[in-house]
Each structure stands twice: as C-alpha cells, then as structure tokens.
C-alpha cells in the first residue's frame, strides 16, 4: 500500500511518465487494474492521449486499441465505478435548483429560530450563497455537528464580531435541518464521495493502483478519499507539477509550487502517522517544449521566488507580444496568424493551436464570427448557460405580465419567444402570426397600450391621421386592423385563463400543475421538438440538443418544486426566483471535441498540454493576475476565525490571499501548455472603451528577454511601417478577410492619391481569380462611389407614382426642401417607427379636430359673439373637451398616465384657444363659414374639386387637402372670403419661402377658394380678403409683460398672443372695417395691421398687405412650382439638395432620413441648396419679371 509522488516542472511530458508508470504497475501486479484519476474537465482527452501512448509502447499498429485493465476516470466517475450497484445510486441526485428549494423551505420552517433571516422573501439571492457555503463545508469535511462546535467556540470568544456569531448561529440551524432533509430523500456529490471513502476503507485494494494527476489542490473530502485508497492497500501515485521535491517540513510561501508542496507534506505526514510506506519520489525528465520555452520556465520559477536569472532568448519568434487597438483587431490578428502559420508549415493541424483568455465572456461576441470568416474551425470549450433560452424567457414574461398587468415590454417578450402562437392549417409554424406581432408592437408603441386595454372586448382601431393623404381606409389598413386584433384577442384568450387558474392556486403543487397544463395546452413542448428536428435536419447537432435539454431541466425543476415545496403556500415571486436560480447554474451538455479544431478556452481551467502553439489573448493587468472577489456568504475574515477550531482533516477552500499567491503558478501552467510557441496579446481598450494596460506578468517577461511588444494597426495604410513580420502580412488571412483589408488599403490609397504597393496588386489579382472575383470588383468599384442619387428609370417612376400624383401642398413643399427626402418618404414610403410620444403631427391633429368641432358648434348654434359672456365661453370649452374625450381616434391618450397628463395639457390649450377665438370674433365682422374644407378626393370623402395640373404627356398632378377654416365678411355691398390656417408655432407669411416653393400652402388654398367661390358661398360673388395663421398655444407671459399689470391688462396681454399673422388684400374698406376696435388704438390685436398717427399703414403692416395683382402673381407662381415639381418627379430626377436658409438653419437638422441619405456637406458632391434672403418687394418684382418673360 505504498504512496509515491511523481513530479517535474510543466515543461516535462508528465503523460509520458504516467504511461511508463502504468506499464510498470501492470507488470508488478499482473491482472490488477490501474485507475488514472484526473479532473473531470479533461477526462475525455486524457483517456484518448494515455491510450495512444500505451498503444505506442505496446507497438500496436492498428488504430483500434483498448486496455481492459486501465480505467481513466474523474473522482465522480470513480464513485460510480465502485458504487454503481449500491443503494446510494437509487436516490435522486440533488441539483442546484433542488438544493435552493430545500434551503428555502428549511429557512421558512426555522425562521423564528434565526437571527438574520426574518424576511426570507426579500433575501432569495442569499439562498444561493448559503447553498454554496454549505457545499464548501461538506467538501471541507465540516458537518453540521462540527459546525455547531465551532459556532459554540466562537460564540464564547469575546473578540469575535457579532456578524460572524450571527451567521454561524443561523448556518448551524440551517445546515442541520438541511442535512436531515437531504438524507431522507436525496444524495449529493459530497455524500457520494463520503460514501465512497467509507466503502473503500472496508475494501482490500491490494495490487490495484491509482495514479492521480492534473490537480493543483484537493478539497478535504478528496484528500480523505485518497487516504482511504491507501488504507485499503491500494498503490497510490500522485503526479504534481514542481521543479524539485521539497526536503524539509517547512514550506516557503514564496515558492511558486507552494500549494503542491503543501499537498506533499500533508500526505507524507498522514502516511507516516498511519504507517503507510512512502516510495522514493520519481523525477520526470522527458522535456516536451523547445529551448526558448524552457528558458521562460526557468526565469519564471526563479523570478517568482525572488531569484532573477535566466538568459536571453535564442529565438525571439518562440515568445512574442503584440498590442492591438481593440479586442476585435486582436482576435482578427490571432486568426490571421494561425492561417499564415498553417500555410507556411503544412504539418500543422488546427488542433495544434489553442487560444486562451482568463474570461471568455470578454470575447463572447467576437471570436466565433471572426474565426468563421477566417474559415477556422473552433471548439468553444465553455459551457453554455440555459438561462437565456426562450422557454425560460416565456415563463418569466408570463409571470411578469401577471405581476405588472399587461405591460408592453412583458407582452412583447412573451410573443417574441417564438414558442407561443396559434397553430392553424395555413400557418402551422406561426410565421404569419409573428408578422402580426411585429405590426402589433408598432401599434402598441404608438398608442401607449398597456393594462386593461389588452383585455377589452372592443376591437382596437388602427388609423393614420398625420397626413391627409393617409386618411383613406386602405386595404392595407384593413389588414392591419385584422392583424392587431388577432394578436390582442389571442393574448387575452390564452393567458387570462392561466392567470385565473393561478389565482385560485393555494399551494405550490396547484400552481405547478397550472403552469405545466398551460405549456402543454399551448404546444410549447411540441414547438421545442420541432426546433430540435429542424436543427438536426440542418446538421446543427449541438444546437439541436438545446431544446430537449432545456425542457428536461425545466420538468426536473418542476418535479423538485412539487416534491419539496408543493405543500407550501404558493408565492409567484419566490417560485420564479427559484426557477431562475436553478437555470442560472444549468448548462447544456457539451460533446467533447474529437475533430481537428482550434481549442478556445479559459486560462483559469485545467488544460491538456497537447498543443504546439498557444495564444494568450486579453493579457491585461485586470485579469493577469486575476482580481479575486470576496462574495461568499462567509467572507475571508470569517473563515479565518473558523480555521483554528477545525481538525487536521478539515479545511475550507484556500483563502483569497493564497489564491492571489497561486496566480503566478496558474499562469505558469498556461505559459507551458504549448510546446513550440507562446504568443501574448492585449487590446488598448476594452469593450467599454476604457484604456487597458499590459499584464505585469507579460511586461516582466518582455523586459527580461528583450521582447518588444509590437503595436499592430487594425487596418492597412499607405505609409511605410516597419514591423516584423512585414506589415502587409498582418492583413493576409482568408480570402474574405483579406478582401476586407484590400478594400481598406485601396480606399486609403485612393484618398492619398498614391501608387499601390505591388504586393497588394498581387493580392488583388489572386482574389479576382478566386470565387470572390465578382465581389472583389464590386467592392473596389465602391471607391469611385459618390453620394449622388441616380435618376430613376421610367418603369420605376411608373411603379412608384403611376400616371397621377395625388399630393397635398405640404408634400410638394417637402419636395422643395429636399427632393431626395420626398422620394424616400412618398416614393418608397419609408416611415419612422411610431412611439407613444406625441409628435407635432399628433398634437396638430388633436387641435385641428378640436377647432373643427368648435367651428361647427359656432355655425350650428348661430351665436352672437358680442353677447356671449365669460361663463358661456367656459361652458362651450368644457363641452368641447368632453366631445374630444369621446373621440375614438384619440384613444392613445388613454394608454398611460403620462399620456393622460399630456391630454390635460392639450385640453388646457384648447380652452385658451376657445376663449381667444370668441374674443377675436367679437372684435371683427369676419365669421367662419366652413371648417376642415376638403378639396379633392380624400379616402371616401370628397369636397371641392382638386387642383389638377398637366405635367407632361398623360401625366398630371392632383393637389388635394383640407383648408382649416374659411371666414367671410360683408362690407357694404361686397363680400370677402379669407382663410385661417392653424399652426403649432408662430408663423408669418415668408415671401422668400413662397418664391422657392417652400411656402405654397396658403397660396394654393386661396387658389382653391377663388376657383370655387360660388360653391363655398352660392349667394355671393366674393373676393379674397386674407390668408392668416393662427397659433395653437397656451400663452406664457414674460415678466415684463405682467409686472405691475392688473387683471384686465393681463387678459389683454394674453389675448394679443393669439393675434393672426399672414396677409390681407389691399382694400381700403376691408382694412378699415375688419377690426371694429382699430379706431381706438390704431393697431389691431387680431390682424397684422396698424396705422401711423397720419392714418397710413405702418411699414411692418405694409409687408402684410398685397394688391390683387400681387396676390394673383403669387398664386400663379405657386401653380408653376407645383408643375415644376411634378415634371421633375415624373422624369425620375432625385437631387439630394437639402435647403439651407439664410440663418444657416437646414432641413437636415430634424430629418429622420439622415442615416439613409448619408448627406455630408464636407463631400464635394453634397451641397446645400442655399436660399437667398429676399424681401417682399424683391420677390414680387422677380415673379413679375419671370412671368412677363415667359408670357404668363
């Protein structure tokens, strides 16, 4: 029953020595088994490699080889090997989820006895920490009784803090109760190990051998197991990494191999005490790395122990360091290097390479896409967590919908899992339904829908009212209405019955049954199986295993919940907390790599040393050395207080200080994984943009060996760069990746106007001859690309617009603001995604509807404005607001409290507008005779004839719209008609904009009025009086406007804020009579007119007055601009010519199409259309001259 140690530094081929020892033991104990015990993570590869070495030693030529007396096992598999027929394996294994549930139940049942856990509901996260702590106790051979003893000793120690005393008091109670529960129904890994230890102690293992390798430390229970092997007369050989065997009892904490030396001393002391024979240690000598890596090893061992030595490298190529600008550039260069090394050395295989980093999560979204592009196969040696699977997301969303009462985010999360949909013959996989979901999401966002509106019986109504041309109930809108109501009804009909069932559940088992029934009834299990079958068909076997494993894990957790907490009162929050906690630790089973693949793994994990070239990426000071976090339930200080009271065979996980001291050793193991080459790399900045620094370990190595870290550019340039290897080689990888860099280089060369490097010309030639030839030419042609829209082909114009363009005036104004933007918006019909925030179009629609209702009230009730008092005005305003609340098209205001608040703000403005309009009408003889007057066909409605303009052979433009308000005034024997246009901000008639086609609306409206005077007012032959803007606003006064003012003065100041702007006809009688109060003040508070003391119009007022000829010329000019716009649109002309006004304001400032247009004023081909500032007289003069010139 001897104990023997084998040792040697990491540069030695330990597996060779183990293979030799296996054969020796077999020869010494013929027919007896040899067990090779390794960490579970490397068991599969260890088995393959050891058998290969044994096959070579036995000179077996066949590739098929087996050893019946050699077993390669992990410790857990060793337990199965010896105990598989015992009763212990009849018990269900405790999982992380069942452990959490048991602890949760234990804490609930003993809450009155506990000090820290009065409210476990609020501390569910602590349950996981306690579970981890109890597992550490069990692995440390510290049972409930031992913990109770320790707690008593510490409680008697006056120096101990109250925190540790309270924690140990509670842990003692919880641990004892937890173990009682475990023993009665489950078995966990520690119990199995302890049972194996007990059973082995009773066996006679004489002649049987156990070789243990790959461990950096052992838990107390693992040490007890190994000691049991020796007690049972087994031959135990422990293989450790160290350069020399310790000769003295005292271990130096400065030694790189401190932990391994402690293992030796512990086992030797135990062997001596138990009279177990210790054989002479065996020093392994067969070196597996090259001379440069041996020098690195020698330096690292000596420098870590304070003895700096070593010599310069003979070949700098064996250890290199490079810095990249980003993690992306870093990984891209690693992949490029792998391809180049394989190209230069055909004997290299993918499996000769390993890419390691301390935390793969830093590179989780980078490595696979880059290696796929580089056509490099990888084995991603990291277990994938189940917690992000759609099944768990569906259950979480389901419970969140119930908890937050149909919040938008939760409902969409549920529907977007892809698992819940109505299965029909026409749509068996729900593809059409998911299209409806996306449409519904846009509608819900726009309307701000949540809560009871998902449950209402009344159908949702989809409508668009931000543009008059969109008011027609199109077939598309009818379809959208059907789709959104299909989704609404499906959600209500599907989840509400489940919620009702869950509400009646009083115990955990009733709730679990309700959830299970819901999932089965809605075919969730069948959908998961369909996913599996689809991925199997596509050959994605690893992906295909995920749905089934997730479902099995969920069912197991549900069974555990029913078994452990089924009789407890049901709490939805705690149920989901336990379910999420269970999935947090659940991972998919991974198939070990047997293919020729590059290993991508984490450097903190034990690795096989079967690679030739190792890349250590992300070698920064943040992770090398690792920053140890102390997040355990018992912190390090607490464990230090426990340690003196533990027996020799009891100890907890190594301390944080010892972990930090072990960092040089763990990194040393990583350095020595490869046999031929070691390459360090690190990025200048992380994913968060924070600057990163090189690891002090790597910095030490570089400084000692004179290795200069190369700072590698992320893209090629035309400037000469001195690097080794040559600069150009940095960018030659797969055809696809090389093409990307060729484009970058060509662009840099194009911009610098320099000659191309002949080597890049050669690369271009090679790529053109490859399968990427056409793509290469296509991408290179982009260098000549200019951001200039192409003229549309006639067939495209025909498809977009037909023979007739139906447009509102505002659309045509948008054309003159930027022709390309018009094409995007009205040709391609690109729209921004609507949200529940109020847009200017939404508020404008609301105000327009309110004013329309008001004007109809006024004309219907035939009010006398001179006699209406303040109280009556307020009553009318109140009635108007009530009517608006009942208008279904504004249901979006019922979506949220915020929208309700905004509606109150709008209503307050409406009430102010009502009062202002009544006061204005009391001062003038102008009276509204029409509101929202249609012209042209809009949807199913029609009004006055549209304005039709021929713009070429068979083409025409049909201008239609709504005039907000038409007013009429009678002066003497003459009648006048004027228009009022509502605006959300102060507006004056801008003659410059009118000239350039940017302000045609008022002029075209007047054109409609004068063409249809008899239809508007058949009893009269009216003339045009005015075109005026009225602002929608809730007026605010500046301090100078209200200071020292009485109530009447304040009301007057507020009233002035609503004064109308625009222009009036130059008609002396009209101007004098339009405002009855103007004689008193010489200035109208309603209209833009004022008189001097001499009785003439002021200069400002002159700008608001137009003669009949001037007005007609402006209208003709607007008609001309409409025709010109139509001609350009039908010709397919698409200039990107955004307007820039004289104040340097541009139309691009608020354009939603910036990302589409990519307009850049710095580009020579992109220019603003500069608008020259013109005053009224200049505009009228230029229009007159142009019309005379063209004979109009």
Curated annotation (Swiss-Prot):
State a single Gene Ontology molecular function: 5'-3' exonuclease activity
What Enzyme Commission number(s) appear in the record? 3.1.-.-
Q: Which UniProt keywords apply?
A: ATP-binding, DNA damage, DNA repair, DNA-binding, Exonuclease, Helicase, Hydrolase, Nuclease, Nucleotide-binding
Per its UniProt record, the required cofactor names are:
Mg(2+)
Highest rank taxon of the organism:
Bacteria
Q: What are the GO BP annotations of this UniProt entry? A: double-strand break repair via homologous recombination
Chain ranges passing through the membrane = none
- Specify the signal sequence span: none
Q: Please report any disulfide bonds recorded for this protein chain, giving both cysteine positions.
A: none
Q: Which one Pfam family would you cite for this protein?
A: PDDEXK_1
Functional summary from the UniProt entry? The heterodimer acts as both an ATP-dependent DNA helicase and an ATP-dependent, dual-direction single-stranded exonuclease. Recognizes the chi site generating a DNA molecule suitable for the initiation of homologous recombination. This subunit has 5' -> 3' nuclease activity but not helicase activity.
Q: Which family does it belong to?
A: Belongs to the helicase family. AddB/RexB type 2 subfamily.
UniProt protein name: ATP-dependent helicase/deoxyribonuclease subunit B
- Source species: Pediococcus pentosaceus (strain ATCC 25745 / CCUG 21536 / LMG 10740 / 183-1w)
The root-end lineage is: Bacteria, Bacillati, Bacillota, Bacilli, Lactobacillales
């Amino acid at each position: 029953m001897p104990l023997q140690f084998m040792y040697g530094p990491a540069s030695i081929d330990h597996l060779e020595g183990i293979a030799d020892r296996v054969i020796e033991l077999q020869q010494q104990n013929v027919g007896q088994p040899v067990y090779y015990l390794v960490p579970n993570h490397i068991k599969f590869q260890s088995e393959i490699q050891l058998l290969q070495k044994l096959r070579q030693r036995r000179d077996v030529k066949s590739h098929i080889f087996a050893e019946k007396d050699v077993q390669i096992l992990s410790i857990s598999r060793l337990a199965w090997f010896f105990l598989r027929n015992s009763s212990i394996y009849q018990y269900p294994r405790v999982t992380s989820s069942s452990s959490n549930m048991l602890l949760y139940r234990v804490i609930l049942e003993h809450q009155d006895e506990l000090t820290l856990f009065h409210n476990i509901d609020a501390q569910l996260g602590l349950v996981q920490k306690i579970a981890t702590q109890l597992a550490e106790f069990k692995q440390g051979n510290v049972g409930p009784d031992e913990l109770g003893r320790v707690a008593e000793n510490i409680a008697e120690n006056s120096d101990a803090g109250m925190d540790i005393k309270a924690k140990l008091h509670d842990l003692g109670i919880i641990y004892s109760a937890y173990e009682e529960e475990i023993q009665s129904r489950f078995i966990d890994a520690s119990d199995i190990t302890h049972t194996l230890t007990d059973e082995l102690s009773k066996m006679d293992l004489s002649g049987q051998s156990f070789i243990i390798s790959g461990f950096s430390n052992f838990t107390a229970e693992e040490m007890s197991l190994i000691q049991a092997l020796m007690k049972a007369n087994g031959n135990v050989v422990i293989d450790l990494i160290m350069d020399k065997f310790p000769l003295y009892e005292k271990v130096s904490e400065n030694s790189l191999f401190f932990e391994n030396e402690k293992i030796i001393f512990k086992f030797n002391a135990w062997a001596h005490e138990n009279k177990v024979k210790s054989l002479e240690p065996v020093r392994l000598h067969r070196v597996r790395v090259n001379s440069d890596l041996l020098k690195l090893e020698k330096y690292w061992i000596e420098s870590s122990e304070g003895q700096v030595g070593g010599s310069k490298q003979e070949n700098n190529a064996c250890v290199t360091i490079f810095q990249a600008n980003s993690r992306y550039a870093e990984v891209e260069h690693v992949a490029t290097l792998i391809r180049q090394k394989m190209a230069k050395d055909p004997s290299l295989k993918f499996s000769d390479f390993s890419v390691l980093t301390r935390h793969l999560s830093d590179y989780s979204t980078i490595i696979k896409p880059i290696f796929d592009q580089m056509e490099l196969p990888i084995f991603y040696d990291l277990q994938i967590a189940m917690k992000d699977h759609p099944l768990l997301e569906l259950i979480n969303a389901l419970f969140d919908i119930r908890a937050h009462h149909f919040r938008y985010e939760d409902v969409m999360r549920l529907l977007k899992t892809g698992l819940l949909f109505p299965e029909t013959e026409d749509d068996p996989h729900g593809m059409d339904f998911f299209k409806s979901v996306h449409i519904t999401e846009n509608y819900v966002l726009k309307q701000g829908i949540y809560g009871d509106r998902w449950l209402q019986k009344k159908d949702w109504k989809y409508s668009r009212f931000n543009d008059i041309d969109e008011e027609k109930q199109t077939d598309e809108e009818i379809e959208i209405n059907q789709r959104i109501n299909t989704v609404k009804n499906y959600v209500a009909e599907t989840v509400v019955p489940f919620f009702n069932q869950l509400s009646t559940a009083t115990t955990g088992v009733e709730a679990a049954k309700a959830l299970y029934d819901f999932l089965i009834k809605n075919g969730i299990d069948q959908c998961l199986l369909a996913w599996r079958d689809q991925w199997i068909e596509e050959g994605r076997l690893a992906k295909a295993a995920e749905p089934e494993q997730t479902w099995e894990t969920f069912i197991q957790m549900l069974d555990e919940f029913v078994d452990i907490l089924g009789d407890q009162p049901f709490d939805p929050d705690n149920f989901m907390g336990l379910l999420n906690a269970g999935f947090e630790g659940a991972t998919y089973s991974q198939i070990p790599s047997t293919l020729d693949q590059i290993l991508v793994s984490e450097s903190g994990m034990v690795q096989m040393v079967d690679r030739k070239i190792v890349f250590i990426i992300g070698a920064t000071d943040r992770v090398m050395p690792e920053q140890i976090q102390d997040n355990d339930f018992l912190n390090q200080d607490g464990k230090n207080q426990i340690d003196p009271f533990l027996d020799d065979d009891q100890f907890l996980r190594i301390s944080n200080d010892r972990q930090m001291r072990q960092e040089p050793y763990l990194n040393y193991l990583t350095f020595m994984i490869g046999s031929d080459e070691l390459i360090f790399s690190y990025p200048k900045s992380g994913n968060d943009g924070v600057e990163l620094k090189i690891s002090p370990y790597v910095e030490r190595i570089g400084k000692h060996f004179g290795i200069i870290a190369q700072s590698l550019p992320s893209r090629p340039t035309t400037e000469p760069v001195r690097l080794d290897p040559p600069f150009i080689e940095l960018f030659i990888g797969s055809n696809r990746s090389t093409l990307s860099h060729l484009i970058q280089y060509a662009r840099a060369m194009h911009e610098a106007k320099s000659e191309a490097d002949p080597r890049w010309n050669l690369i271009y030639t090679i790529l053109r001859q490859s399968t990427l030839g056409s793509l290469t030419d296509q991408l290179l042609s982009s260098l000549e690309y200019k951001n200039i829209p192409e003229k549309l082909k006639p067939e495209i114009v025909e498809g977009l617009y037909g023979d007739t363009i139906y447009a509102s005036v505002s659309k045509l104004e948008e054309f003159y603001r930027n022709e390309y933007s018009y094409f995007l918006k009205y040709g391609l019909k690109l729209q921004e995604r609507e949200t529940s925030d109020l847009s200017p179009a939404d508020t404008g629609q609301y105000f327009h509807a309110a004013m329309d209702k008001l004007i109809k009230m006024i004309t219907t009730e035939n009010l006398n404005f001179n006699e209406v008092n303040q109280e009556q005005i307020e009553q009318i305003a109140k009635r108007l607001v009530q009517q608006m609340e009942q208008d279904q098209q504004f249901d979006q205001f019922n979506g949220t409290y915020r929208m309700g608040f905004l509606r109150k703000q709008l209503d307050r403005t409406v009430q102010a507008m009502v009062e202002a309009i009544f006061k204005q009408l009391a001062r003038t003889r102008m009276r509204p005779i029409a509101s929202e007057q249609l012209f042209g066909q809009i949807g199913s409605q029609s009004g006055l004839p549209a304005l039709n303009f021929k713009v070429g052979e068979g083409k025409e433009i049909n201008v239609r719209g709504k005039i907000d308000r038409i007013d009429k005034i009678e002066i003497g024997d003459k009648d006048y008609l004027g228009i009022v246009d509502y605006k959300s901000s102060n507006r004056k008639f801008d003659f410059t904009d009118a000239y350039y086609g940017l302000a045609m609306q008022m002029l075209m409206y007047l054109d409609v009025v004068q063409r249809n005077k008899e239809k508007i007012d058949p009893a009269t032959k009216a003339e045009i009086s005015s075109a005026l803007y009225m602002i929608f606003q809730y007026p605010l006064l500046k301090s100078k406007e209200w200071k020292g003012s009485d109530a009447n003065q304040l009301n007057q100041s507020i009233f002035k804020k609503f004064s109308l702007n625009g222009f009036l006809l130059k008609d002396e009688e009209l101007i004098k009579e339009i405002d009855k109060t103007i004689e008193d003040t010489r200035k109208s508070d309603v209209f833009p007119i004022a008189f001097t003391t001499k009785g003439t119009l002021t200069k400002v007022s002159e700008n608001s007055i137009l003669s009949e000829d001037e007005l007609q010329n402006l209208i003709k000019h607007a008609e001309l601009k409409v025709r010109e716009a139509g001609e350009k649109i039908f010709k397919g002309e698409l200039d990107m010519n955004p307007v820039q006004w004289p104040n340097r304001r541009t139309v691009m400032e608020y354009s939603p199409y910036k990302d589409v247009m990519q307009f850049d004023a710095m580009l020579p081909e992109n220019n603003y259309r500069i608008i020259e500032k013109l005053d009224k007289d200049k505009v009228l003069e230029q229009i007159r001259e142009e019309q005379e010139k063209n004979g109009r």
